[in-house]
UniProtKB/Swiss-Prot annotation:
GO terms for molecular function: rRNA binding; structural constituent of ribosome. This is Small ribosomal subunit protein uS11. PANTHER family: 40S RIBOSOMAL PROTEIN S14/30S RIBOSOMAL PROTEIN S11. Part of the 30S ribosomal subunit. Interacts with proteins S7 and S18. Binds to IF-3. Located on the platform of the 30S subunit, it bridges several disparate RNA helices of the 16S rRNA. Forms part of the Shine-Dalgarno cleft in the 70S ribosome.
Amino acid sequence: MAKAPARSTRKRAKRQVADGMAHIHASFNNTIVTITDRSGNALAWATSGGSGFRGSRKSTPFAAQVAAERAGVAAQEYGLKNLEVFVKGPGPGRESAIRALNATGYKITNITDVTPIPHNGCRPPKKRRV
């Protein structure tokens, strides 16, 4: 059986993006940080669960901070400088994720809350009785 000729594989150069957007989805159970370019194509993402936190530790502000740092470091190879931040959800990791992105070295130009608010849509879950 003949072997296929070996192709030379070179790592493709990452495209350079100056401005980007950071989408922070902070739920009660997890925090998802996605960094995209201006048109919404994902460059890097990280979650609290994927950062090594399991169970109730996923929903802590520190887990959100670690996830935001990981996403920020992964997106730095695209040459990002400025970030516009969109925050969605009521979770505990909202503020700490923004602070972590700021500490990673990005210039945050705008922070927008895009939490979906129903105009009396679905019935909310029943109240907990402990």
